[in-house]
Amino acid sequence: MTFKTLDDLTDIAGKRVLVRVDLNVPVKDGQVTDTTRIERVAPTIRELSEKGAKIILLAHFGRPKGEPVADMSLKAIAPAVEEILDQRVHFAADCIGDKAANAIAEMNDGDVLLLENTRFHKGEEKNDPAFVTALAANGDLYVNDAFSAAHRAHASTEGLAQHLPAYAGRTMQAELEALEKGLGNPKRPVVAIVGGAKVSTKIDLLQNLVKKVDALVIGGGMANTFLAAQGVDVGKSLCEHDLAETAKSIIAAAAAAGCAIVLPEDGVVAREFKAGADNAVVDIKAIPADAMVLDVGPKSVAAINDWISRAETLVWNGPLGAFEIAPFDKATVAAAKHAAARTRQGSLVSVAGGGDTVAALNHAEVADDFTYVSTAGGAFLEWMEGKPLPGVDILHKQK
C-alpha cells in the first residue's frame, strides 16, 4: 500500500493547501454535541500550520442536495473547530468563486480558512469537471484527511486528487495503516465479530469476510436469522426468515473457505425490551415461543473469548446484543474488555468500526485500548466488504 503522506510535504510555507476533512458532526440547538471527527483532523491541520502553509478546509455537512440550505452551513461548525485547534478559523461563504478567492487572498502563512459546504453545489456529488477545476483554483496542493468520505467519488474527495499533487493526512494515513493490519495483510489467525440487527445490511460484508478470516463470530439480531435457517425456533426474536437461503449460502461458503462460523450456544431472553426486564439465560434450542433473544449468553461469551484468545488479529463490526439497555449489554462488554486486555498486552491487533460498534466500545470504556477504532461508518463498511474506495485509490495512483 503506497501513498504520499505529510512526510513527503516539505517547503510548503506560503503554499495554499486544500485539506478535505470530515466535519459532518452532530449538532443540537446550534451546538456541536460530539467533536470526535474534529479532534481526529486537528493533528493534520496543526502540522500544516506549523509548516507555514495556508490551510483551506473543504467539507460537507448534511445532505443539502446541491443548493444552499441555511441550517447546513459550516459557519456553525467553525467555533468548535477554533476551540479544538485553539486557533482562529476564518470562514468564507462559498467554496468556489470570488467569495472563496477573496478570503484566500487575505490569508497569512499558518492561517486556517474554512470554506462553505461543498454540497451546496450540485457539482460536488456529481464529481463535475468544471466544479473540480473551480475548487482546484483555490489551492496548490491537496491533502485528503477524510477517510469517512473516501467511498464517494465526489469532487472534493476524488476529483481534486487528479488536478493537484495529492497526499494523505494523518488521520487518513492512520486509518489505512490500521486497515492494512486488519484485513489487508493481517497476522493470523484472524477473527471477525459481526453483530447488529439485520443480515440484509451486511450480506456483502459476510460474503467477503468468510474468504478472508479464520473464524467469523455472528451475534446480535442477525444471529437469529442464521439460527432459524438451521431449524432453531427463535420465538419472537428479531429475525429475517426470508433470508434463510442467504444465511445457508454464507455458511456453505465459509465451510468451503475453511472459515469457522461461531453462532450463539445460549441466549438471554426476555418478553419485553426495556431496562431491567425480567430475563433468563436459556439454551439456544430452548427459546420460549413468546420470548425474544436480546443478548448472547455466558456459554457463548466464553466461546467468543476463547476465539479472541487464539486470534492474532480481530476485526469487529456490530454489537453482540441490544447493548443500549442493561442487562443486554453484558456479552458485548465482556468480549470488548477481553479484546482490549489482549491488545494492551501486545498480543492482539484489534480494529473496530461502525457507529454502533464505536458506541458499544465507548459504553464498555475500552475504545482507547483497541489498536484502531474507525469513526468512518460507511467507508469502513465498504472497506470490510472488499469494495474499492475512490478517495483512497486515487491517492495510490498518485504515488
From Swiss-Prot:
Chain residues that bind substrate: 22-24, 37, 60-63, 119, 152
Subunit structure comment from the entry: Monomer.
Species name: Sinorhizobium fredii (strain NBRC 101917 / NGR234)
Protein name in UniProt: Phosphoglycerate kinase
Claim: Transferase is one of the keywords in the record: yes
UniProt-listed InterPro entries: Phosphoglycerate_kinase, Phosphoglycerate_kinase_CS, Phosphoglycerate_kinase_N, Phosphoglycerate_kinase_sf
Family: Belongs to the phosphoglycerate kinase family.
Name of encoding gene: pgk
Catalysis: reaction(s): (2R)-3-phosphoglycerate + ATP = (2R)-3-phospho-glyceroyl phosphate + ADP
